[in-house]
Design a protein with these regions (language model features):
Chain A
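Low-complexity, charge- and small-residue-enriched intrinsically disordered regions
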Residues: 24, 29, 171-175
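A structural signal for multi-pass alpha-helical bundles of membrane permease subunits
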Residues: 38-322
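Alpha-helical transmembrane segments of integral membrane proteins
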Residues: 25-37, 322
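Generic secretory/membrane-interface signal
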Residues: 4, 10, 29-32, 122, ...
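Short, intrinsically disordered terminal tails adjacent to the first/last structured region
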Residues: 1-28
Length: 322, 299
């Protein structure tokens, strides 16, 4: 979820909290009976989470790293093969084309999604506070990627799909949305934007509501246009929330699977074979778990790098404005 | 024309555009839901003859009957179906069990941990908390395959335990979110209760937990939606219909449809059936869901 952005924010917050607590400790009696027995209770309370963390988060992460150096087909024990998987990765054209396809998908779906959701949030904020309208806008977020993919698979069908019928009615040529190389990824990205846009817009809308109206008064007195005020006042104030939303959407988009698997299945001819799709087919189609683990690790490294880059850019532009 | 009049006119033109845009967005958002319904109530053959009709063509309940297994295989094939059906009640129960149990468990355990991190004084607290937070950095894809191997080794493939445990015990985000909220709460009442001799657990369940009900609801609703719609993890660890959730059933049903001439009406009926529980949840809690989502971004 709110991954890195919140982590950074938390470090600041927890720093404050520790400071506060240190001060508190200085004034209260350190031998106070109030905290006797705290440690025992604390370990009991975190025990379930600790087990979950150790067994299903930490252990699999380390094991994933280990498996990436092995030949492993699940049924027999993993066999250490050193860097072979990594060598294979460097020479695997399908992997690099998958990476390219995924990056193309991420760029399209995150940028388009961001523009539409910022405009939608601003429009909502400006003209209506109706919860019903906001509710309708998040409807696609509530349904699964499988449902969303299936519906659009039908609506984008080249013969009977309503979208092509409308395009043809206006004199256009029918588009092979999900079955042509050029359109497969843009189509999947559009479906993803349709599904996620409302969710992003509602988060941005909530951010807009926290901006006090008094900020705009000076601008209004100066006769600045609404668009100008939006650009010079609203957007900079929204930057932290936009950064959060972009990081979240990028991370999610890199791991797209459901929509692709019910619409294009990665086709035609790998044109929409996104990374998670390829990793899945390696692991469960060819039982090459070692290599699948290597690719997962590569995806992880890419995500970390991108997130840090985004945070860096964000911090740089923050210090510009201050 | 005075300056104010110009401004007012520009103002209302802008408002007109804004409404036009918003209505456009709403139409695109909602139209597919209508199209599901319209197609699901149509006859497959009439549909291919008149695909553009805005209303159901050759109105029939046939697709729903096919999907729910109320039609015989012959009837189903005669109507353009594959003869496959979805035992909806059964998959619905699986989805409810999977989503409810994992959500309730993870929110409950996260609340306990958040209390330990925000209220109790113990050695190793900050270390443990930072350790937990590192889990936020790890994307699902890195842990999913090894977790599949682990669940297989534990002999838990095709069991609810195998589906739920990896998500039901620990969520770094939940713990972090609840801890932040608890740190922001005033502790006066809790301290008073402690001085009066109430035990820590009584304070936790009697005072802290009720005061945290807002964020607990937020995390529950978002968690429930996420688990209900989850497809990838159940795809990995279940192959047996006895535990598969609705998302998988729909995907299997879609695959069983003939590729050359898919049973569109039946597929849309199945899609609608799969979406209805979420739509019902939305009817019941719409306002709170909307507020929860907004809140989750700001916190």
């Amino acid at each position: 979820m709110a991954v890195l952005e919140t982590t950074a924010r938390d470090q600041r917050a927890s720093g404050e909290a520790t400071r506060r607590r240190k001060n508190a400790r200085r004034t209260t009696n350190p031998y106070s009976p109030a905290h006797r027995g705290d440690a025992k209770l604390a370990w009991v309370l975190i025990a379930p989470a600790l087990v979950g963390f150790a067994v299903f988060a930490a252990y699999p992460t380390l094991r994933g790293i280990y498996l990436s150096f092995t030949d492993f087909a699940v049924l027999s024990p993993p066999e250490w093969i050193g860097l072979d998987n990594y060598r294979q990765l460097l020479g695997d054209e399908v992997f690099w084309s998958s990476l390219g396809v995924t990056v193309y998908f991420v760029l399209l779906s995150v940028s388009l999604g961001l523009v539409v959701s910022v405009v939608t949030a601003a429009v909502l904020h400006r003209i209506t506070s109706s919860t019903v309208i906001r509710g309708l806008i998040i409807l696609p977020f509530l349904i699964s990627g499988v449902v969303a993919g299936t519906v659009w698979w039908w609506m984008l069908d080249s013969q009977l799909g309503i979208v092509n019928i409308v395009i043809k009615a206006f004199g256009g040529d029918g588009i092979q949305f999900l079955t042509s190389r050029d359109w497969a990824i843009p189509s999947v990205a559009l479906i993803n934007v349709w599904k996620q846009m409302g969710y992003t817009a509602i988060i941005i809308f909530a951010g807009l509501q926290t901006i006090p109206a008094t900020i705009y008064e000076a601008g209004r007195v100066d006769g600045a246009s609404e668009l100008r005020m939006f650009r010079t006042l609203t957007l900079p104030l929204l930057r932290p929330i936009l950064a959060l939303v972009v990081v979240l959407n990028v991370i999610n988009a890199f791991q797209v699977f459901d929509i692709v698997s019910v619409t294009t299945k990665g086709g035609p001819a790998n044109a929409s074979n996104v990374l998670q799709m390829y990793i899945y087919s390696k692991a469960f189609g060819q039982f090459d778990f070692g290599y699948a683990a290597t690719m997962s690790l590569a995806l992880f490294v890419i995500l970390i790098a991108i997130t840090f880059l985004q945070m860096r850019l964000l911090r740089a532009s923050e210090s510009d404005t201050n | 024309m005075t300056a104010t009049a110009t401004r007012r006119r520009r103002f209302s033109v802008g408002k007109g555009f804004a409404w036009a845009y918003l209505i456009g967005v709403l139409v695109v958002t909602i139209f597919p839901f209508y199209w599901i319904l319209r197609t699901a109530l149509s006859d497959n053959y009439a549909l291919s003859a008149d695909p553009a009709s805005p209303l159901p063509v050759g109105f029939t309940w046939g697709p729903f009957k096919r999907v729910l297994g109320l039609a015989t295989t012959q009837e189903s094939i005669a109507e353009g179906g594959s003869g496959a059906s979805i035992e909806i009640g059964h998959f619905l129960v699986n989805s409810i069990v999977y989503a409810t149990v994992s959500t309730v468990l993870v929110v409950f355990f996260s609340t306990l941990a958040a209390y330990a991190f925000s209220r109790l004084h113990w050695r190793g607290r900050n270390l443990m908390f930072s350790l937990f937070l590192t889990a936020l950095m790890v994307p699902g894809i890195l842990t999913l395959l090894p977790n599949f191997v682990l669940v297989k080794e534990l002999g838990l493939l095709n069991t609810f335990a195998g589906m739920i445990l990896p998500f039901g015990l620990f969520s770094a985000f939940n713990i972090f979110f609840l801890r932040q909220f608890m740190l922001g709460l005033s502790t006066e009442i809790e301290e008073a209760a402690l001085i009066d001799g109430a035990g820590r657990l009584r304070v936790l369940f009697g005072i802290t937990l009720p005061m945290t009900s807002g964020p607990i609801f937020t995390l529950s609703i978002l968690g429930f939606i996420g688990m209900w719609n989850d497809y990838f993890w159940p795809l990995l660890v279940t192959s047996d219909e006895s535990v598969q959730p609705l998302t998988l059933a729909l995907a299997v049903f879609k695959q069983s449809s003939p590729q050359a001439q898919p049973d569109w009406a039946g597929l849309m009926a199945a899609t609608l059936v799969a979406a209805v529980p979420m739509l019902a949840l939305f009817m019941a809690f719409g306002r709170r869901i909307v507020n929860s989502i907004g809140f989750s971004g700001i916190k």
